[in-house]
Design a protein with these regions (language model features):
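A conserved FAD-binding loop/helix module that cradles the flavin
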Residues: 1-57, 140-157
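Flexible, glycine-rich terminal cap/loop adjacent to redox cofactors
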Residues: 45-52, 60-157
Length: 157
């Protein structure tokens, strides 16, 4: 979905979506597979690592004008007990400011946030669009400035 080009992304989630399309069509339907953005998440040694869309290296190889932004923030309100670091990297096209991909590393809230980026990729959002997202706020679970919003604000500078 990001590049419009075919890609090999061997994930169970992709296989399930394609299976659903195949099953519906086998029963006489007209379903189409819309594509994927390649969202992946793993937990390793207490950290959650997630990616979606293109990496900076992939974007460069496809001749995008790559704009990389990396920030460190807190996964919940910084003054709330248990707040931990979370790192967000956004990859955007410098010519159009369209989001091309992102990676997130932290202890919690990573999968939810990479899903926000995947939704942004699916809808071809720009960095400015990300800045305008209305994300949740509650000190024990979500800071007033979500790390995605912080990264988008830094990327817009």
């Amino acid at each position: 979905l990001v590049t419009g080009r075919p890609d090999y992304i061997p994930l169970g989630s992709t296989a399930n979506k394609q299976g659903r399309v195949a099953g519906e069509n086998a029963a006489g339907g007209q379903a189409m597979f819309g594509g994927v953005v390649g969202s992946m998440v793993v937990r390793c040694f207490g950290l959650v690592v997630a990616t979606t869309g293109l990496t900076a290296a992939q974007a460069r190889a496809l001749d995008y004008d790559v704009q990389e932004t990396t920030i460190q923030a807190q996964d919940i309100a910084h003054y709330f007990p248990g707040a931990a670091d979370i790192h967000v990297k956004l990859i955007a096209d410098g010519k159009t400011n369209r989001l091309l991909g992102g990676q997130i590393v932290g202890q919690r809230g990573v999968a939810k946030r990479v899903d926000v980026l995947a939704t942004a990729l699916h809808n071809r959002l720009t960095i400015a669009d990300l800045q305008g997202l209305d994300l949740t706020y509650a000190p024990p679970v979500a800071p007033v400035w979500d790390p995605i919003l912080i990264a988008a604000n830094v990327a817009a500078r």
